[in-house]
Amino acid sequence: MTEITALEAVAAIEAGTLTSETLVRGYLDRIAERDDVVKAWVHLDPDQAIAQAKAADAASGGLLRGIPVGVKDIIDTYDMPTGHNSPIFEGKVPFGDAACVALCRTANAVIMGKTVTTEFANRHAGATTNPHNPAHTPGGSSSGSAAAVADGHVPLAFGTQTGGSVIRPAAYCGVVGYKPTFGDFSRVGIKMQCHSVDTLGLMARTLDDIALFRAAVLKLPIVHIDRDIGRPRIGICRSPVWDQAEPETKALIEATATLLSDKGASVVDVAFSAPFTDIIDDHAAITGFESVRNYADERLRNPDMVSEELMNGPMKRGLVVSFERYVVAQRKATAFKAYVDSLFDKVDLLLTPSAPGEAPKGLAATGDPVFNSIWTLAGTPCVTLPAGTGPDGLPLGVQLVGLRHDDDRVLSLAAWVAAHLN
């Protein structure tokens, strides 16, 4: 039952061959069986989930009718605590839902519970493990959401991305992760870290489910994946940080490019030109400057309740970024977005790593967002697809980057790639 896709489940519920209650109970059984190891959930109330499922069964219609959704614990829910993995907010229930959660409820979804996040969606890790090997990180900061989808606890889950917090954990856990064009999804009711780049993202096991989920969050009719979109023009973008990729990741990107070329795609090399070869430093300047100010209350009023890792790491670094440096970085980011847009005059997708390698061993850190931050700054839609395994038998992903505000087409092009990867 937990292997069914969200799209299939909605169709079955609408047809009367499946009930949401049956579906939700199946997922709850899976969670009871596995979450002592995976530790994906910080708040889960089975009775509340079943009550929502019964209400969905009694209702009619809705893009997500009866479908369980996991919600990262920096996203507000009026009927559940939103704790941000911080003692400052432990047990506190917001006054209302985040816009994305409210829109899911409007679509008759079941808000299953809250998934583990790193502290304030930053570096200090939570308890979640990688479902493929609990000795390894699931990635972060959307740790619980990625692990929950990968381990069959829910078919859909929300993440957020400031650096690489959707794409990287999705890749580490072997699921599909999608970061939309910056600004497409409302951020109302989501803990703000960096207002220039913070982006709500989605995780699922299939691109069809991502398309369904996207439509619900936008409150629009679903734009189904176009299976006849044709052969894409693909640019291999090793990016300025290619030297930080592990050998298995470099080999995967090269092998994927060869495979897609053999299947009929046009494949060319794409390299960054000056002055954008150090653009990752500008992402760091912008996020450092903004985050230390957006966390002002936590930092100044409750410093003893902020982790040392956050207080003496990102916050300390952010305090030394001058306003002049911030302005320079913002101006460069504006130019960079236009530059990246221009790359799509000649290609439809960029092929690039989702992460440096497979999920690192240990739970104290969640991996490096070095292959994600530049695209988050560019505001482009990004998709990670499971594409192989590394030397420890853990998932490897490939990242596909598309033109801003062309997300529906990007998802269809990604489906062409996925069909040949599989």
Give the positions of each predicted feature.
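Structural helix-boundary/capping segments
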Residues: 33, 106, 151-156, 160-243, ...
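Residue-level signal for inorganic ion chemistry
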Residues: 27, 49, 210, 234, ...
